[in-house]
Amino acid sequence: MPRSRRTDEVSQYVSRLGSTRTAARLRFPGGFSGASRKPRRVAMLSVHTSPLHQPGTGDAGGMNVYIVELAKRLAAINIEVEIFTRATTGSLAPTVELAPGVLVRHVDAGPYEGLAKEELPAQLCAFTHGVMQAWAGQRPGYYDLVHSHYWLSGQVGWLAAQRWGVPLVHAMHTMAKVKNAALAEGDTPEPAARVIGETQIVNASDRLIANTAEEADELVRFYDADPAAVAVVHPGVNLDRFRPFPQGSDELRPGNAPSGRAAARARLGLPQDALIPLFAGRIQPLKAPDVLLRAVAVLLDRDPSLRSRIVVPVVGGPSGSGLAKPEGLQKLAARLGIADVVRFHPPVGQERLADWFRAASVLVMPSYSESFGLVAIEAQATGTPVVAAAVGGLPVAVRDGVGGFLVQGHEPEAYARALGRFADAPELVERMGAAAAAHAQSFGWDTAASATADVYTAALSDHRRRARAHHG
């Protein structure tokens, strides 16, 4: 299909936004040099989704967990965090203390309800106004640094950081060009306006935080990011919450994962001897829950005897663009002849989610794109292996053949083969689950917060150096 004139104009504009830079090797936290002073207080921006929202509902997902856990751990090392997010109901207090040292500030920007994420760019001016109003009531130098999450927040952070004279650290979480390169069937491409906005943010940021080395490479390759300004910080997992037994249990002993799984199944009303492949996440084409259902249909065609001992829970709610909704999946399950083994459940809180992970034989993540895939680490921390698409950050989160299996592509037959290995050798669940739990131990949020603080320190040091050079 020939490119439109409009597409060419956008491409030329994006090209002009990026400067030509010589390739340099990527430098990560620990490799930065500069003064050692870390910030006292950070303004964290999350325009489109509140850290108070339950993950798995609407646009709330892994990013919400990321912001909450990171902010708490930063506060624990004496970096105060104030999170600005859009108010979605009039009953919200202007400020909410999320934890000691962590404050959530609600900003009025557009109607409380009925505003899709795709409509939020029109409200960025109002959101920025609210952020500036909050800042105006503080003493000079109140915020040492701005840390924005997702491109909408990056646009606000760009202006705020310049106005306050502080550095901007940005985390993309997802990128338009990367998503558009791997669209699921029925999904809607990200608009050119987002590509332009992300390119602007890359050039405006003092530091960019990537979840994995692959994401860092994508920032350089797709957006011409300065490699020296990109830092890799792996997200973490709440190891107190996601463990083979609930927190406070007296059964937290090595080798007890099987009894932990049995206890979780009893709490959730699941059969003890069943193969339970779990999908947990937002129901949208990007996450590809339909691939799991199709794979189960293939598996049952090959081995009809499995029907009496398989349960497929789908835990999550609708989100984003495309056609994937719970009712759509229910109809698909009926067409595939597997409605009797698939169970749909609404999104649940983190404690309950941990129980679903414990109960599962395997977590299935057939996503088309994942910057990291927090739920993969969370499930493994509970002692549950993962079958995931070999995309984005999932090869970092999942060690292929050790704590689960990575699948190339999205063909249901390939996922059916992976699930069949667990059906044929049930002991694989416990063996891989133990390896998965050991792997997850290296992804604590304390480590992520410490590395993020190093990025902040480097950004502050460079910012001061440039300011001194500018003023002679």
Swiss-Prot record:
Binding, 1D-myo-inositol 3-phosphate: 48, 59-64, 117, 150, 174, 194
GO MF: acetylglucosaminyltransferase activity; D-inositol-3-phosphate glycosyltransferase activity; magnesium ion binding
Gene Ontology process terms (BP): mycothiol biosynthetic process
Record's catalysed reaction(s): 1D-myo-inositol 3-phosphate + UDP-N-acetyl-alpha-D-glucosamine = 1D-myo-inositol 2-acetamido-2-deoxy-alpha-D-glucopyranoside 3-phosphate + UDP + H(+)
Residues the entry annotates as binding Mg(2+): 357-358, 360, 384
Signal peptide (residue range): none
Binding site for UDP-N-acetyl-alpha-D-glucosamine: 54-55, 62, 282, 287, 348, 370, 378
Keyword Repeat: no
Assigned EC number: 2.4.1.250
Protein keywords: Glycosyltransferase, Magnesium, Metal-binding, Transferase
Top-level taxonomic group: Bacteria
First-level EC class: transferase
Residue spans crossing the bilayer: none
A Pfam family per the record: Glycos_transf_1
PANTHER family linked to this entry: D-INOSITOL 3-PHOSPHATE GLYCOSYLTRANSFERASE (PTHR12526:SF510), GLYCOSYLTRANSFERASE (PTHR12526)
Function: Catalyzes the transfer of a N-acetyl-glucosamine moiety to 1D-myo-inositol 3-phosphate to produce 1D-myo-inositol 2-acetamido-2-deoxy-glucopyranoside 3-phosphate in the mycothiol biosynthesis pathway.
Annotated family: Belongs to the glycosyltransferase group 1 family. MshA subfamily.
Quaternary context: Homodimer.
Protein's name in the database: D-inositol 3-phosphate glycosyltransferase
Originating species: Streptomyces griseus subsp. griseus (strain JCM 4626 / CBS 651.72 / NBRC 13350 / KCC S-0626 / ISP 5235)
